[in-house]
Each structure stands twice: as C-alpha cells, then as structure tokens.
Amino acid sequence: MAKMTRKPKGTPMSCSENTNVDAADPLETLDDGVAAAAFRRLVRHLRHRHDAQNIDLMGLSGFCRNCLADWIVEAGAPLDKAAAREVIHGMPAGEWKARFQTEATPEQLARMAESMTRNP
C-alpha cells in the first residue's frame, strides 16, 4: 500500500487535506487495486451525475470534483491542475463548467463555508 507523507510546513492544503494515516484503520488494509477500482467508480458516478454541483458537494461533504483532481496530483500523478481536472471531469474543466455548472446562490456559498470549517 502506498504510504502517504506529510507535506512541508506552509504548503497549502487541498480541501483541508488530512495526511494523518492511522495504520490501525481498516481502510489501510484495502488492496490498492480494490481502492483504485472504487475510486474510479466514484469518479465515473460523478461524471454521470453532473447535476450534483461542486458547490453542493462542498456544502455537504467539504470536497468536490476539483478536490479529487488536486488529490490525485498530490498523490503523485504527473499532471498539472488542468490535466488532473480533465481526468476527473471527463472533459476540460472549462467545458464542464460551461455545460453543467450553475451560478452559486448565497445559501450554497454559506453552506460551503460552514462545511469547510468541519474538515480536518
């Protein structure tokens, strides 16, 4: 299993990244192939559910598609931010935004801000 490492002090966290890995966590016993298959299924599900807006994902869970893109880069994918977002969105991020993203409401922005305070 790939070991997560702590970023240098002062490095910004992505969607409140938590790199504290507890070896006793059952998640750490998952085979990497199984974990990768589940991750790919999640990404494909989010590609299909473009009606689930990133702002709503942030408001409910404190992460979104863009966070997933950041996380694959932080995990070592040799991609820049734009390429990583294209992998997750299934198309360039600008195209995804133009086709599917709606204007965020003040309520959505407030939910996101409150949700982010609960991230580790």
Report the location of each language-model feature.
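Domain-level signature for proteins that mediate thiol-based redox and metal-cofactor handling
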Residues: 2-120
